[in-house]
């Protein structure tokens, strides 16, 4: 891997050692499953849960891994409960962390999905809705103009934000080009290569 998950792992270890909870969000179920398995193997002394819509396992865990949409839906259900003075018995929540007292950090893996035309609004509203005391950790290897993105987070959430970037690559990048040629030019191209080899 590229090592971009390391800040999230530090946060998980730190906050769990303080008796707090962490939510780790991903854009797709497959990545949630992968992160759940990877983190559970790497940190067997920490309790992990997963919520993807298809799977609901250990929702009381110290670290919950889920899609961003599940976090969004639960946050807004909790807001509706508070606003309408409803009891939790009337609404089924995917998880029931006390956001104010227990939750310390939310990791947004592949945070560049905030630029997705269809799903970006969910990511934006989730970030804007999180209480100020909850640390936001955004991970991306491909986000465009990260400085502007950090400034946006500061503006909408009143949080001091730091950008940690690393231009070096842990995994070397090799460029390949795959070309197709119409059959009529293939014979000519093949003959030219054959002549150069001989």
Predicted regions and their residues:
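Walker A (P-loop) phosphate-binding loop of P-loop NTPases
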Residues: 1
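Motif I (Walker A/P-loop) of helicase-class P-loop NTPases
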Residues: 4-13, 119-124
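Post-Walker A helix-loop "phosphate-sensing" segment adjacent to the P-loop in P-loop NTPases
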Residues: 14-21, 157-159
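Short loop/turn elements that form and flank the Walker-type P-loop nucleotide-binding site
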Residues: 17-19, 44-45, 58-61, 99-104, ...
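Conserved nucleic-acid-binding Ia/Ib motif block in the N-terminal RecA-like helicase ATPase lobe
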Residues: 20-73, 151
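Conserved nucleotide-binding/hydrolysis micro-motifs of P-loop NTPases
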Residues: 29-31, 55-57, 69-72, 112-113, ...
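SF2 helicase catalytic motif II
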Residues: 68-70, 79-137
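Conserved interdomain linker/interface between the two RecA-like ATPase lobes of SF2 helicase motors
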Residues: 128, 135-137, 142-154, 159-198
């Amino acid at each position: 891997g590229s090592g971009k998950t390391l800040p999230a792992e530090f946060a998980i270890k730190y906050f769990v050692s303080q008796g707090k909870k962490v939510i780790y969000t991903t854009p797709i179920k497959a990545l949630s499953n992968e992160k759940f398995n990877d983190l559970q193997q790497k940190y067997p002394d920490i309790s992990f849960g997963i919520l993807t819509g298809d799977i609901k396992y250990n929702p009381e865990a110290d670290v919950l891994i889920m899609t961003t949409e599940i976090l969004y839906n639960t946050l807004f259900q909790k807001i509706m409960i508070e606003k309408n003075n409803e009891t939790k018995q009337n609404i089924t929540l995917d998880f029931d962390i006390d956001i104010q007292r227990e939750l310390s950090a939310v990791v947004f893996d592949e945070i560049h999905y905030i630029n997705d035309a269809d799903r970006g609004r969910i990511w934006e509203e989730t970030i804007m809705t999180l209480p100020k005391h909850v640390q936001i950790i955004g991970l991306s290897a491909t986000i465009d103009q990260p400085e502007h993105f950090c400034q946006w987070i500061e503006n909408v959430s009143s949080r001091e934000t730091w950008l940690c970037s690393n231009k070096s690559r842990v995994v070397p990048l090799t460029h390949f080009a795959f070309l197709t040629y119409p059959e009529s030019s293939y014979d000519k191209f093949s003959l030219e290569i054959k002549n150069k080899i001989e």
